């Protein structure tokens, strides 16, 4: 359950982090996550898109949890995340938003609300170990300049044309991405520690994405989907046709169409999803070792 990271935006089923982890665990997936989902602690409205590839706030992650119809006691693992869509991607990618405002929203949603949903997960699934998957740096100071500008334009739907110094604008954009990544990581860790103290047991584990600044979009060792700079309107991923069909059903406008078709850009590619799966497998193995030693 969660947003596009747990869903595996742009990836074929067999390449998704959740799929790789499930194969390792020898279990089946009940996929609740979808692109664009927010935690939505205070939301009651809901709607369903024709494809999980189409970014949409709803069903929220809380609604995903509430809509689970299986036997809660049979669930052994829950892979989850959330928060960036409550903060809003446009805010993270807006250098004109003050750092303190970005930090406030990040603390509220990746801290307070992530803790709230994690507490509900551990209460609903009494036998499950929750794996809280961290975010990654979407951009870094190792990202190519044209790549930074391209991703900004995609997120906001406008040409990169700052009125002030372009270099300063790019730098602040990157700093926003790095700040969100680092702060959300710390908040996720704190939420996991809080739940484990509260329950008196190892009910949750924080799983770092395993990605560093060199793995950001347009960086030398990028593990994220990227548009080619000479063909910025061509989607690079495995699920673009699914989104194309879904877009026609939704009937959105031309601007929304382009954003939907390119919505995998900035998400973990095949290698990136595999890296996160490795991190999850390692975390599960460590948890099993600790349990056996008790």
Language-model-detected regions and their locations in the chain:
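Conserved SGNH/GDSL esterase-like catalytic core that processes O-acyl groups on lipids
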Residues: 7-105
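Cysteine endopeptidase catalytic domains of the caspase/legumain-like
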Residues: 266, 272-273, 290, 294
């Amino acid at each position: 359950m969660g947003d596009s990271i747990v869903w595996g935006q742009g990836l074929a089923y067999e390449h998704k982090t959740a799929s790789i982890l499930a194969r390792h665990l020898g279990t089946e997936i009940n996929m609740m996550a979808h692109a664009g989902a927010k935690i939505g602690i205070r939301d009651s409205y809901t709607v369903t898109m024709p494809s999980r590839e189409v970014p949409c706030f709803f069903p929220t992650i809380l609604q995903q949890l509430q809509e689970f119809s299986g036997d809660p006691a049979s669930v052994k693992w829950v892979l989850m995340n959330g928060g960036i869509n409550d903060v809003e991607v446009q805010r993270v990618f807006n250098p004109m938003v003050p750092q303190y405002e970005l930090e406030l929203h990040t603390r509220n949603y990746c801290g307070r609300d992530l803790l709230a949903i994690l507490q509900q997960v551990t209460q609903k699934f009494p036998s499950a170990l929750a794996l809280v998957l961290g975010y990654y740096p979407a951009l870094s100071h190792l990202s190519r300049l044209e790549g930074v500008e391209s991703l900004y334009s995609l997120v906001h739907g406008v040409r990169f044309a700052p009125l002030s110094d372009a270099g300063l604008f790019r730098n602040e954009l990157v700093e926003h991405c790095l700040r969100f990544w680092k702060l959300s990581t710390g908040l996720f860790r704190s939420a996991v520690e809080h739940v484990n103290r509260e329950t008196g047991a190892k009910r949750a584990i924080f799983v770092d994405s395993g990605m560093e600044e060199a793995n950001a979009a347009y960086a030398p060792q990028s593990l994220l989907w990227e548009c080619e700079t000479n063909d910025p309107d061509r989607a690079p991923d495995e699920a673009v046709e699914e989104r194309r069909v879904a877009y026609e059903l939704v009937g959105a406008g031309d601007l929304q169409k382009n954003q939907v078709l390119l919505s995998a850009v900035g998400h973990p590619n095949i290698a990136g999803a595999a890296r996160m799966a490795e991190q999850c497998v390692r975390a599960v193995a460590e948890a099993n070792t600790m349990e056996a030693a008790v």
